[in-house]
Amino acid sequence: EQLELGQRAADALEHTWSKVRLERIGESDPELEETLEALTARFARLEDILIKRVFRAVVAVELADAERVLDVLDLMARLGLIESTDQWIELKELRNTIVHEYELDDLPALQRRVYQATPILQRTLKAVSRYAASQAAGSSS
């Protein structure tokens, strides 16, 4: 269920991400600006779903004691589902910047960071999907 929610969010993000070219970010184009607004919002949504829903579901499956976000991220790193805890702390900070609208004076820089970080979220969701499939296969035998 959490993975399905994550996949729907990832599909929406991928749809928007595929319309953007890194070198065009910062151009004065109303259509591009609208697409970039959708990109940042969808990025923040997927990051939120991964940390608050998908990763928490993994914690439950692992019967782990991980209440704090840092503990959750450490567990995900130990399981090989994320590249590093530090990277995800940066992603969480990026999401907070989007949601709380900090750094709006340099919106193109923020949008470039989101564009470049999007594949990390997509890879992570795929890794968690593989993990879930292996857990399901292990429990059915």
Residue spans of the language-model regions?
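Solvent-exposed interaction patches of small proteins and small membrane subunits
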Residues: E1-S141
